[in-house]
């Protein structure tokens, strides 16, 4: 087990996966900045004068971390910043879930038809991403020790898991899926 934890292929996979998640979160926010401003305001955690600067800065910080995770000399710092961001997201979501404000949009991966509401799943997901980011920061990655085959395996695995991650987030946001989930929870309005 220890050899797998310290395996450079696993470390490369984790770095690429976190980078892809951060990029996938940042790019739609940059495209729809006004909408994301509303999402940040809906969390009701920041004083009004900080909402706009935070909403403008966050996607750039996410994108910067995503890029920096691919630069060996910046990888550890970027992973630490990413872990802090994911812990911040977890805290913000948990506070609102605790307040009973689960009707607000997560803001995780923005899209025009987003209906993704927050819940404990989002808290746990953000904590898992924080844990993976801390793993990236803790495990050294020696690129020279990775074969081409291992690097391609890490890349393919990271891309596939990122696509699954985004597809799951997208599917939960579809109105029909949301309705079916509410029926299973016993919250149907029918």
UniProtKB/Swiss-Prot annotation:
The keyword Cell membrane applies. InterPro entries: Methylamine_util_MauE. It is found in: Cell membrane. Keywords: Cell membrane, Membrane, Transmembrane, Transmembrane helix. One of its GO terms (biological process) is methylamine metabolic process. Pathway: One-carbon metabolism; methylamine degradation. It is a multi-pass membrane protein. One of its GO terms (cellular component) is plasma membrane. The chain crosses the membrane at residues 8-28, 49-69, 77-97, 126-146, 154-174. It comes from the Bacteria. May be specifically involved in the processing, transport, and/or maturation of the MADH beta-subunit. This is Methylamine utilization protein MauE. It comes from Methylophilus methylotrophus (Bacterium W3A1).
């Amino acid at each position: 087990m220890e050899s797998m934890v310290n395996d450079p292929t696993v470390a490369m996979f984790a770095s690429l996966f976190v980078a892809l998640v951060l990029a996938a979160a940042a790019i739609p926010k940059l495209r729809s900045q006004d909408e994301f401003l509303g999402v940040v305001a809906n969390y009701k955690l920041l004083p009004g004068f900080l909402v706009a600067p935070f909403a403008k800065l966050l996607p750039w910080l996410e994108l910067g971390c995503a890029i920096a995770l691919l630069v060996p000399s910046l990888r550890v710092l970027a992973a630490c910043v990413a872990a802090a961001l994911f812990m911040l997201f977890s805290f913000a979501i948990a506070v609102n879930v605790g307040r009973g404000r689960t009707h607000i949009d997560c803001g995780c991966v923005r899209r025009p038809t987003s209906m993704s509401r927050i819940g404990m799943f989002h808290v746990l997901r953000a904590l898992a991403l924080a844990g993976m980011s801390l793993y990236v920061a803790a495990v050294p990655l020696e690129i020279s020790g990775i074969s081409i085959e291992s690097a391609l395996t890490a890349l393919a695995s990271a891309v596939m898991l990122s696509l699954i991650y985004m597809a799951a987030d997208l599917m939960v946001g579809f109105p029909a899926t949301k309705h079916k989930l509410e029926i299973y929870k016993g919250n149907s309005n029918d």
